[in-house]
């Protein structure tokens, strides 16, 4: 294993999301309790918290208002190694585990969900290469994300007719000699228009259903890759969601991820991790709104005293804080299980995504209510957080779908 990755004064050397090795003292070390952090994790989170407050928070309103991609944050993340969080150290990445990266996303989500989503989608775009790629494919692509690289990735699965029902996708990949020719369309692809490297799902044999889907790595500049328009969104406007078109696009056979026909299994595996990242972002949004609401109640005076002294306000704040804490603990349990490769990880992860995103929607709505007219105004930012929270109930699987999957898993475990 190569030497440690440095975050300024902080040195970290850990095992990645995929490593089966264990180290005695690493950022990814598991403790006996879910809440206890290693010293390295504490230092990392202090650094991320300072970065979020000083560099990201002041730009959040502008990013939302202007639909501006957070270039400044991307460059800072690149300098700190945060653009390759899950890439194993031996490939030049940071080598974080799922739990640590989830905590990073929560901290950034507190101040700017667009920036958190950009970083989340960056990790998602690499997941299938890390989890399922051959050694040759990993060697070809993963080192390119090290050394302060600003290369961006995207996870391209959703199509106009294939959202919750991903088996309905129409994109096709036909093998011709030592290449695959891809034709089709993707939509709502997070980071799509800024991505340099895409992981793309397509059917290689539609007659086989789930066993006929495969995964490919596609690079920007490949003839036949066409970037469509960016969507105008309700929230998280700084992170683009884009159309992608593939017109007789040729990729070398070596860019097949894993084995042909196993793409759907790879997709489900990646989504089980994506969902806990979404949940972590949701907890961050909720925490950020809660903190702003609490501060407002201490400063806003009505009836001759701060509204924090009013019992109805105290009840609302108590419920909001309880719900956020419960969501955080459920997310931590899910990430801990996923890091341990426990078979319950995907089940608890789905629960965490559902509960945390519903919590974010409720808490941000209540934050607007607690702050009254001020909460409805842009400068106080909780209205933005309310709009951002909505997406967490939709992406990586709507909460109706995640509830259905959870229910089936509990009732029919076989």
From Swiss-Prot:
<feature type="binding site">
    <location>
        <position position="408"/>
    </location>
    <ligand>
        <name>cyclohexa-1,5-diene-1-carbonyl-CoA</name>
    </ligand>
</feature>
<dbReference type="GO" id="GO:0050660">
    <property type="term" value="F:flavin adenine dinucleotide binding"/>
</dbReference>
<feature type="binding site">
    <location>
        <position position="164"/>
    </location>
    <ligand>
        <name>FAD</name>
    </ligand>
</feature>
<dbReference type="InterPro" id="IPR006089">
    <property type="entry name" value="Acyl-CoA_DH_CS"/>
</dbReference>
<feature type="binding site">
    <location>
        <position position="158"/>
    </location>
    <ligand>
        <name>FAD</name>
    </ligand>
</feature>
<dbReference type="Pfam" id="PF00441">
    <property type="entry name" value="Acyl-CoA_dh_1"/>
</dbReference>
<dbReference type="Pfam" id="PF02770">
    <property type="entry name" value="Acyl-CoA_dh_M"/>
</dbReference>
<dbReference type="InterPro" id="IPR006091">
    <property type="entry name" value="Acyl-CoA_Oxase/DH_mid-dom"/>
</dbReference>
<dbReference type="InterPro" id="IPR013786">
    <property type="entry name" value="AcylCoA_DH/ox_N"/>
</dbReference>
<feature type="binding site">
    <location>
        <position position="211"/>
    </location>
    <ligand>
        <name>cyclohexa-1,5-diene-1-carbonyl-CoA</name>
    </ligand>
</feature>
<feature type="binding site">
    <location>
        <position position="275"/>
    </location>
    <ligand>
        <name>cyclohex-1-ene-1-carbonyl-CoA</name>
    </ligand>
</feature>
<protein>
    <recommendedName>
        <fullName>Cyclohex-1-ene-1-carbonyl-CoA dehydrogenase</fullName>
        <ecNumber>1.3.8.10</ecNumber>
    </recommendedName>
</protein>
<feature type="binding site">
    <location>
        <position position="400"/>
    </location>
    <ligand>
        <name>FAD</name>
    </ligand>
</feature>
<feature type="binding site">
    <location>
        <position position="164"/>
    </location>
    <ligand>
        <name>cyclohex-1-ene-1-carbonyl-CoA</name>
    </ligand>
</feature>
<feature type="active site" description="Proton acceptor">
    <location>
        <position position="124"/>
    </location>
</feature>
<feature type="binding site">
    <location>
        <position position="408"/>
    </location>
    <ligand>
        <name>cyclohex-1-ene-1-carbonyl-CoA</name>
    </ligand>
</feature>
<feature type="binding site">
    <location>
        <position position="211"/>
    </location>
    <ligand>
        <name>cyclohex-1-ene-1-carbonyl-CoA</name>
    </ligand>
</feature>
<keyword id="KW-0285">Flavoprotein</keyword>
<dbReference type="InterPro" id="IPR036250">
    <property type="entry name" value="AcylCo_DH-like_C"/>
</dbReference>
<dbReference type="InterPro" id="IPR009100">
    <property type="entry name" value="AcylCoA_DH/oxidase_NM_dom_sf"/>
</dbReference>
<keyword id="KW-0560">Oxidoreductase</keyword>
<feature type="binding site">
    <location>
        <position position="398"/>
    </location>
    <ligand>
        <name>FAD</name>
    </ligand>
</feature>
<feature type="binding site">
    <location>
        <position position="190"/>
    </location>
    <ligand>
        <name>FAD</name>
    </ligand>
</feature>
<comment type="subunit">
    <text>Homotetramer.</text>
</comment>
<feature type="binding site">
    <location>
        <position position="396"/>
    </location>
    <ligand>
        <name>cyclohex-1-ene-1-carbonyl-CoA</name>
    </ligand>
</feature>
<dbReference type="Pfam" id="PF02771">
    <property type="entry name" value="Acyl-CoA_dh_N"/>
</dbReference>
<feature type="binding site">
    <location>
        <position position="164"/>
    </location>
    <ligand>
        <name>cyclohexa-1,5-diene-1-carbonyl-CoA</name>
    </ligand>
</feature>
<dbReference type="InterPro" id="IPR046373">
    <property type="entry name" value="Acyl-CoA_Oxase/DH_mid-dom_sf"/>
</dbReference>
<keyword id="KW-0274">FAD</keyword>
<dbReference type="GO" id="GO:0003995">
    <property type="term" value="F:acyl-CoA dehydrogenase activity"/>
</dbReference>
<dbReference type="InterPro" id="IPR037069">
    <property type="entry name" value="AcylCoA_DH/ox_N_sf"/>
</dbReference>
<feature type="binding site">
    <location>
        <position position="396"/>
    </location>
    <ligand>
        <name>cyclohexa-1,5-diene-1-carbonyl-CoA</name>
    </ligand>
</feature>
<dbReference type="GO" id="GO:0052890">
    <property type="term" value="F:oxidoreductase activity, acting on the CH-CH group of donors, with a flavin as acceptor"/>
</dbReference>
<feature type="binding site">
    <location>
        <position position="157"/>
    </location>
    <ligand>
        <name>FAD</name>
    </ligand>
</feature>
<dbReference type="InterPro" id="IPR009075">
    <property type="entry name" value="AcylCo_DH/oxidase_C"/>
</dbReference>
<dbReference type="GO" id="GO:0051262">
    <property type="term" value="P:protein tetramerization"/>
</dbReference>
<comment type="function">
    <text>Mediates the conversion of cyclohex-1-ene-1-carbonyl-CoA (Ch1CoA) into (E)-2-cyclohex-1,5-diene-1-carbonyl-CoA in biosynthesis of cyclohexane-1-carboxylate, a by-product produced during fermentation of benzoate and crotonate to acetate. Also able to further convert (E)-2-cyclohex-1,5-diene-1-carbonyl-CoA to benzoyl-CoA.</text>
</comment>
<comment type="similarity">
    <text>Belongs to the acyl-CoA dehydrogenase family.</text>
</comment>
<feature type="binding site">
    <location>
        <position position="275"/>
    </location>
    <ligand>
        <name>cyclohexa-1,5-diene-1-carbonyl-CoA</name>
    </ligand>
</feature>
